[in-house]
C-alpha cells in the first residue's frame, strides 16, 4: 500500500461564523493541496471537514499518517467514537454527539485505510500544518468574496 502523509487544519472567523478547511497530502514526492469553506460553521466542523476531504481524495487504500492540531479530532476518532457508536451516537451523559454527521462521514472515510493519528501543537512552526492553516484561511476567504 502507498504511504501518504496528511496535514489538516480548520479555521473560523467567529465561532460560529464563516469557516474554512485546508489539507496538504504528500505521497511519493507528490503534493496536493485542498481547501474549502462554509458559512455559518464552527472551528470543530472545519477541522473535521479537512480530514474527511483529504481522505476522500485518496483513490485507493493507503497507509496514512494524519497530522492535526485539533485534539477534538484526534481524540474523537481515536478514543471517543467507539463509545458514541455503542450508545447510538450519544455522549456518556446521553446527549446527542455534536457534529455526528461529520463524525459518521469521517468514520466511513477512514475505513479503507491504515491510519495513524498525530497531534501537533498549532502555530508552532510545523511546516505541514502551517501550510494547512494557510489553506484553511484561503477557504475562509473563498466564501467571503
From Swiss-Prot:
List GO molecular-function terms, semicolon-separated.
magnesium ion binding; nucleic acid binding; RNA-DNA hybrid ribonuclease activity
* Residues holding Mg(2+) 1: 9, 47, 69
User: Where in this chain does the record put each RNase H type-1 domain?
Assistant: 1-141
So what does this thing catalyse?
Endonucleolytic cleavage to 5'-phosphomonoester
Q: Could you tell me the EC number(s) of this protein?
A: 3.1.26.4
The protein's required cofactor(s) are namely: Mg(2+)
CC annotations in GO: cytoplasm
Q: Where in the cell is it found?
A: Cytoplasm
Q: Which domain of life is it from?
A: Bacteria
Cofactor annotation comment: Binds 1 Mg(2+) ion per subunit. May bind a second metal ion at a regulatory site, or after substrate binding.
**Residues involved in Mg(2+) 2 binding:** 9, 133
GO biological process terms held by the UniProt record: DNA replication, removal of RNA primer
Main enzyme class? hydrolase
Q: Name one Pfam family in it.
A: RNase_H
Q: What keywords are annotated for this sequence in UniProt?
A: Cytoplasm, Endonuclease, Hydrolase, Magnesium, Metal-binding, Nuclease
What role is this protein assigned? Endonuclease that specifically degrades the RNA of RNA-DNA hybrids.
Q: How does it assemble?
A: Monomer.
Under PANTHER family, the record lists:
RIBONUCLEASE H1
Task: Tell me its family.
Answer: Belongs to the RNase H family.
Query: What protein is this chain from?
Result: Ribonuclease H
Q: Which gene encodes it?
A: rnhA
Amino acid at each position: 500500500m502507498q504511504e501518504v502523509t496528511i496535514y489538516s487544519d480548520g479555521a473560523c472567523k467567529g465561532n460560529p461564523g464563516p469557516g474554512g478547511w485546508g489539507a496538504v497530502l504528500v505521497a511519493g514526492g507528490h503534493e496536493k493541496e485542498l481547501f474549502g469553506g462554509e458559512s455559518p460553521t464552527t472551528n470543530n466542523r472545519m477541522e473535521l471537514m479537512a480530514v474527511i476531504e483529504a481522505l476522500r481524495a485518496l483513490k485507493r487504500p493507503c497507509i496514512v499518517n494524519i497530522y492535526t492540531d485539533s485534539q477534538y479530532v484526534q481524540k474523537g476518532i481515536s478514543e471517543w467514537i467507539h463509545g458514541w457508536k455503542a450508545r447510538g451516537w450519544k455522549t456518556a451523559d446521553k446527549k446527542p454527539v455534536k457534529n455526528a454527521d461529520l463524525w459518521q462521514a469521517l468514520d466511513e472515510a477512514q475505513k479503507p485505510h491504515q491510519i495513524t493519528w498525530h497531534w501537533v501543537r498549532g502555530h508552532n512552526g510545523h511546516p505541514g500544518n502551517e501550510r494547512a492553516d494557510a489553506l484553511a484561511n484561503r477557504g475562509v476567504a473563498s466564501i467571503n468574496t
